[in-house]
Amino acid sequence: MEKSQSSCDTRKRSVVVDVDNTKDRISDLPNRILGKIIVKLPLDEAVRIMALSKRWKSIWDDN
């Protein structure tokens, strides 16, 4: 039983490592594409995103 518990722990750790190594693909998108995304969001969602990111706020101001 300890053996299976140990293998579960190993799998959990490897998943965490994989999550940490994932690339943020949204940041790679050009501003014109991000502008098309942000105008389709509900206003409350757009406001939350703009509060978190200067780039998104700039894109919102341009649209």
UniProtKB/Swiss-Prot annotation:
Gene3D superfamilies: 1.20.1280.50. Pfam families: F-box. PROSITE patterns: FBOX. Residues 23-63 form the F-box domain. InterPro entries: F-box-like_dom_sf, F-box_dom. This is Putative F-box protein At1g47702.
